[in-house]
């Protein structure tokens, strides 16, 4: 329930709070259009001091030709591009809500995704999520750019724990070179072994480091497979 705020009327809507690899989300079943995602309202709900608190908000809506549509909103309010960990959480939410079975296909801003609930016990689950084809690979300032459903910058570093993710991430996120995509998510990647990466991500919209980023992990793996170890078939 959102109240005691002059900006918004009192309302009561059921929601789920899901977390995947440290990314947390508010999820609403919006098949009956009960929620109007105004940016100021989304930001208020995601506020960690005065709202529910989340990295983002997602809506499950009806979609012809798929089990449902996933809409993702950044914690600062506007609708955004694909979120990988959000997609995994949405798949489990859809299963819990009866919107899909164990195997499902859902639409998102970047196209159709297929997901499968591999295990489900209580409120937890293990989800396999298919991503759309990465595109736009290019060299960028001291790193690389690739779009994995969201635009990502990837830079390899010697020690990811020593990186000023917030400061350097904010600088790179706002570079003029990335203005055409509305800014970019910034990933700092340490090669911890053959086929093993350590990744820290600064996410646009959250405007800070997050505990994980699904599309960022995919971006790191895509870039690493091209420029660091092209013969490795599996990357952790």
Briefly describe each language-model feature range:
Residues 7, 11-123, 154-236:
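A glycine-rich beta-to-alpha transition motif near the start of alpha/beta enzyme domains, typified by
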Residues 123-132:
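Short, solvent-exposed secondary-structure boundary/capping segments
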Residues 110, 132-135:
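Zinc-dependent deaminase
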Residues 137, 141-164:
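Internal active-site segments that recognize and position negatively charged phosphoryl groups
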């Amino acid at each position: 329930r959102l109240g005691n705020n002059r900006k918004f009327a009192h309302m009561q809507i059921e929601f789920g709070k899901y977390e995947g690899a440290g990314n947390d989300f508010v999820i609403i079943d919006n098949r009956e259009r009960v929620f109007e995602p105004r940016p100021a309202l989304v930001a208020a709900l995601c506020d960690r001091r005065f709202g529910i608190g989340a990295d983002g908000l997602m809506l499950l809506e009806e979609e012809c030709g798929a089990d449902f549509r996933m809409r993702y909103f950044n914690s600062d309010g506007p609708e955004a591009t694909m979120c990988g960990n959000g997609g995994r959480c949405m798949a489990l939410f859809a299963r819990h809500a009866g919107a899909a079975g164990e195997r499902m296909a859902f639409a998102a801003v970047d196209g159709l995704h297929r997901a499968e609930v591999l295990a489900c016990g209580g409120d937890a689950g293990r989800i396999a999520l298919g991503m759309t084809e990465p595109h736009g690979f290019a060299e960028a300032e001291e790193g690389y750019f690739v779009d994995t459903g969201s635009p990502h910058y990837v830079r390899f570093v010697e020690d990811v724990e020593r990186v000023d993710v917030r400061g350097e991430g904010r600088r790179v996120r706002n570079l003029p070179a990335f203005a055409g995509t509305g800014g970019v998510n910034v990933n700092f990647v340490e090669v911890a072994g053959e086929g093993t990466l350590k990744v820290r991500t600064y996410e646009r919209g959250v405007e800070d480091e997050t505990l994980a980023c699904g599309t960022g992990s995919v971006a790191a793996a895509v870039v690493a497979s091209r420029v660091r170890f092209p013969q490795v078939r599996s990357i952790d």
